Structure formats: C-alpha cells, structure tokens
Amino acid sequence: MTRREDGRLDDELRPLVITRGFTEHPAGSVLIEFGHTKVMCTASVTEGVPRWRKGSGLGWLTAEYAMLPSATHTRSDRESVKGRLSGRTQEISRLIGRSLRACIDLAALGENTIAVDCDVLQADGGTRTAAITGAFVALADAVTYLSAAGKLSDPRPLSCAIAAVSVGVVDGRIRVDLPYEEDARAEVDMNVVATDTGTLVEVQGTGEGATFPRSTLDKLLDAALAACDKLFAAQREALKLPYPGVLPEGPPPPKAFGS
C-alpha cells in the first residue's frame, strides 16, 4: 500500500496522546494530541441550569470551541476582540455539545450543568474531531467528580463512549485522520462522530469540487468506524488510570431515625 507524505498508511491514525489532569481546576481536563493538532478539553460543573430548563429536574451539557490566535501559521484576531463568533466556531461548538449529549443521561445530573470548553492550542487539521474525542474523556472525569460529590441520581449516566475522526478521498484514495495538507486538497471531506456501540451520532460530508457515489460514502463510513474503534481503545486505556485530581467528599449519610 502506498504511504502518505507523513509515512502513514491510508487507514492509519496520526500518533495519539491523551493526557488527563492537564489543568487543575476543572472537574475534567484533557490535552489530546492527534499528530501536530493539540486541543485542550475541559469539563466544568456548575450548579443550576439555563432559565428555560429550570424546574424540569433535568441537567444540561453545553460546549464551546475556540482557537488560540497563534494556533495556525498566521496569527488571527481573537473573536472576543471582533465582538462576534464566526459561523464556523458556532457550528463546531454546537456539534461538540450535540455529540456529548448523545451519551449522557441528563436526568441523572439533577439541575446541574456541565460546561465543556475545547481550545485549540495548535491546529493541523481535524480540530473538531480531536475536540470531541478529548472532550468525552474530560466528560467521563467530570462524571466521576459528580459521583464522588453525591450529585448523581444514577452512578453510571454515560451510556456509551463518543469519538470522532475525519476521513476523505485524497489522490483518489480513502484516508483517515487528515492533516491540514491533505484536508486542503481532498476530493471528498467528511467528519464522522460515532459511539462505541457502533452507531452514528453525526456525519458531515462534502464533495469538494466533484460528486461522489454511494459506494464511496459506504467505504468512507467503514474506514471512519474502524478508526473510531482505535480511538475508543485509546480512551479506555487513558481512563483506566485513577482520577487525576482530588475528588470531593460526598454528603454524609442520613442519620438513623431517632438518633
């Protein structure tokens, strides 16, 4: 099989590193690295829910995505300076939130909110898929934190794992985990979000300058799901280690009647 410019096979992921406990304060904090792409993903727990959610007894999960000004070769202005979020930033933020809400029982949170923040430290393609994959690990740690604090009505509110990967057709070949150099010239570009039970959460695909047949779509999905299986294995391996911070002490047990 012909190797790519970075030496990988078509179905090979970039070197993947997941570092838990990257920062101290959030309930979940992860640095995820897909090759040269590096994203910090944090999951913070706050009491209360948005106004439209109050009184429902349900929790909420929201997500925000941003790129540091120097994440790419050319520095870009912060969107806070511009006074508005770009359409791309809003789209990716919503994608991350939708993806993570697909795996969690919000009723188990009570009226608490998990806020996920994904900040791209360095970009070389696949930032949204890296953000989703890392954010799930941060979310899992946040759930551990909430469980220790006695704030979960169900101790296992996560129904599945979530991961995402980019796939595409480059030089007429189906390839996974595209770096920027391949993404910029792909004939077909697709992002796939999946669960470890084999189901799909979201598929975003575009023919860049040409159409493509259904058979190519099927092959792209097969390649993406096979790549996601490797990501799930890496997530499980990372989460085998103990919680990387200090867990809160839960509420004391109720007193016996009459004591």
From Swiss-Prot:
PROSITE patterns, sorted: RIBONUCLEASE_PH (PS01277)
Keywords tagged on the record: Nucleotidyltransferase, RNA-binding, rRNA processing, Transferase, tRNA processing, tRNA-binding
GO BP field: rRNA catabolic process; rRNA processing; tRNA processing
CDD domains named among the record's database cross-references: RNase_PH_bact (cd11362)
Binding site for phosphate: R88, G126, T127, R128
Functional description taken from the UniProt entry: Phosphorolytic 3'-5' exoribonuclease that plays an important role in tRNA 3'-end maturation. Removes nucleotide residues following the 3'-CCA terminus of tRNAs; can also add nucleotides to the ends of RNA molecules by using nucleoside diphosphates as substrates, but this may not be physiologically important. Probably plays a role in initiation of 16S rRNA degradation (leading to ribosome degradation) during starvation.
UniProt-recorded name of the protein: Ribonuclease PH
UniProt source species: Mycolicibacterium paratuberculosis (strain ATCC BAA-968 / K-10) (Mycobacterium paratuberculosis)
